From Swiss-Prot:
<keyword id="KW-0472">Membrane</keyword>
<keyword id="KW-0225">Disease variant</keyword>
<dbReference type="Pfam" id="PF05208">
    <property type="entry name" value="ALG3"/>
</dbReference>
<feature type="transmembrane region" description="Helical">
    <location>
        <begin position="356"/>
        <end position="376"/>
    </location>
</feature>
<feature type="transmembrane region" description="Helical">
    <location>
        <begin position="407"/>
        <end position="427"/>
    </location>
</feature>
<feature type="transmembrane region" description="Helical">
    <location>
        <begin position="172"/>
        <end position="192"/>
    </location>
</feature>
<keyword id="KW-0256">Endoplasmic reticulum</keyword>
<feature type="transmembrane region" description="Helical">
    <location>
        <begin position="203"/>
        <end position="223"/>
    </location>
</feature>
<dbReference type="GO" id="GO:0006486">
    <property type="term" value="P:protein glycosylation"/>
</dbReference>
<comment type="function">
    <text>Dol-P-Man:Man(5)GlcNAc(2)-PP-Dol alpha-1,3-mannosyltransferase that operates in the biosynthetic pathway of dolichol-linked oligosaccharides, the glycan precursors employed in protein asparagine (N)-glycosylation. The assembly of dolichol-linked oligosaccharides begins on the cytosolic side of the endoplasmic reticulum membrane and finishes in its lumen. The sequential addition of sugars to dolichol pyrophosphate produces dolichol-linked oligosaccharides containing fourteen sugars, including two GlcNAcs, nine mannoses and three glucoses.</text>
</comment>
<feature type="transmembrane region" description="Helical">
    <location>
        <begin position="41"/>
        <end position="61"/>
    </location>
</feature>
<keyword id="KW-0812">Transmembrane</keyword>
<dbReference type="GO" id="GO:0052925">
    <property type="term" value="F:dol-P-Man:Man(5)GlcNAc(2)-PP-Dol alpha-1,3-mannosyltransferase activity"/>
</dbReference>
<feature type="modified residue" description="Phosphoserine">
    <location>
        <position position="13"/>
    </location>
</feature>
<comment type="pathway">
    <text>Protein modification; protein glycosylation.</text>
</comment>
<keyword id="KW-0900">Congenital disorder of glycosylation</keyword>
<dbReference type="InterPro" id="IPR007873">
    <property type="entry name" value="Glycosyltransferase_ALG3"/>
</dbReference>
Length: 438
């Protein structure tokens, strides 16, 4: 009898869930005109797009030729570690020395074994296809929580970008691996799991250093949430993980590991630049130009921190105090505060990058809808925002890059920056209840 009651209870729960699902779908159909405009339908539209992406991604794998660029070099680099070489200065592949931190080595070592020592390209493509779908899922969860972007925009973030599909499943770069870990980190931060969020942020940095472009925003959020003393344990997690991952290489040749894997002064080839094609090559390579870009980058970050992110009326130095001792009572960080700060921090860094290569598109591609629609200026209509997205996509799909494509990319970046500066305040009232921070 008890078993019968349990069975009826389970079937009753299933029937109730099915009824709720049908009710939701019926309501969505009745409001179908709003389906593509109302952010509350993000999950429904996301589910449809993810299903479409399964077919599109695997069609691309089977119908479009794979292009070898860095995969063999990655495999040669991790094979050196497998063979017992822990001196980073002795690790290299076909395209040059190993220049990525230790997290890259461990993850691609796993891929090395999963793909028969790197020879099974189709298996690698399938793994990266799953990685692509996981990235979309994590990004959609972020957009669902911020509830700012109309769902029709997500079509342009998914099915319409040839370059992004190519980066993931036709080129097998390490950039997507770093970004999926970064988006996982942001989801954890949104769930107020700050320790785990910092852990996965550091793991993403250990795959590729571009994730450090989010670091100024993360530091600002940590200080806002915890103050200086409270932020130290979270920063310790970030630093400690880097030490643990790099320990075998640090013990062998510490200076070699640090100089190779965290080389901030590495020179880029003018041949591959997407964003500075209109400059003379001599200027592109000049240290004074690099210093000017760094100065502009840091200046704009400081301006955003002072004028857009910090709006309490107190000095920004008040962030160093314990939140309970500040004059203005601390408020829980909302999803939009977290996402806008991180995405803006990264975008500013990209605008002033010394060079952008084609695979770097994934560094900010999935953040563009938020940057354009979450804090829109009145003068930037839906049509103009779509035009900006289209021009950015066209610029990244122009190979080799031209003076016009590079200039168009900078103009689009300037439009987005102007909107971020002149648009509504990036800290709207949260639509969700705050959760206890961990």
């Amino acid at each position: 009898m008890a078993a019968g009651l349990r069975k009826r209870g389970r079937s009753g729960s299933a029937a109730q869930a099915e009824g709720l699902c049908k009710q939701w779908l019926q309501r969505a159909w009745q409001e179908r005109r709003l389906l593509l405009r109302e952010p509350r339908y993000t999950l429904l539209v996301a589910a449809c797009l993810c299903l479409a992406e399964v077919g599109i991604t695997f069609w691309v794998i089977h119908r479009v030729a794979y292009t070898e660029i860095d995969w063999k070099a990655y495999m040669a680099e991790v094979e050196g570690v497998i063979n017992g070489t822990y001196d980073y200065t002795q690790l290299q592949g076909d395209t040059g020395p190993l220049v990525y931190p230790a997290g890259f080595v461990y993850i691609f070592m796993g891929l090395y074994y999963a793909t028969s020592r790197g020879t099974d390209i189709r298996m690698a493509q399938n793994i990266f296809a799953v990685l692509y779908l996981a990235t979309l899922l994590l990004v959609f969860l972020i957009y669902h929580q911020t509830c700012k972007v109309p769902p029709f925009v997500f079509f342009f973030m998914c099915c319409a970008s040839y370059r992004v599909h190519s980066i993931f499943v036709l080129r097998l770069f390490n950039d997507p691996v770093a970004m999926v870990l970064l988006f996982l980190s942001i989801n954890l931060l949104l769930a107020q799991r700050w320790g785990w969020g910092c852990c996965f942020f550091s793991l993403a940095v250990s795959v590729k250093m571009n994730v450090l472009l989010f670091a100024p925003g993360l530091l600002f959020l940590l200080l806002t949430q915890f103050g200086f003393r409270g932020a130290l344990p979270k920063l310790g997690i970030c630093a400690g993980l880097q030490v643990v991952l790099g320990l075998p290489f640090l013990l062998e040749n510490p200076s070699g590991y640090l100089s190779r894997s965290f080389d901030l002064g590495r020179q880029f080839l003018f041949h591959w630049t997407v964003n500075w094609r209109f400059l003379p090559e001599a200027l592109f390579l000049h240290r004074a130009f690099h210093l000017a870009l760094l100065t502009a980058h840091l200046t704009l970050l400081l301006l955003f921190a002072l004028c857009r992110w910090h709006r309490t009326g107190e000095s920004i130095l008040s962030l160093l105090r314990d939140p309970s001792k500040r004059k203005v009572p601390p408020q829980p960080l909302t999803p939009n505060q977290i996402v806008s700060t991180l995405f803006t921090s990264n975008f500013i860094g990209i605008c002033f990058s010394r060079s952008l290569h084609y695979q770097f598109y994934v560094w900010y591609f999935h953040t563009l809808p938020y940057l354009l629609w979450a804090m829109p200026a009145r003068w930037l209509t839906h049509l103009l925002r779509l035009l900006v997205l289209g021009l950015i996509e066209l610029s990244w799909n122009t190979y080799p890059s031209t003076s016009c494509s590079s200039a168009a990319l900078h103009i689009c970046h300037a439009v987005i920056l102007l909107q971020l500066w002149l648009g509504p305040q990036p800290f709207p009232k949260s639509t969700q209840h705050s959760k206890k921070a961990h």
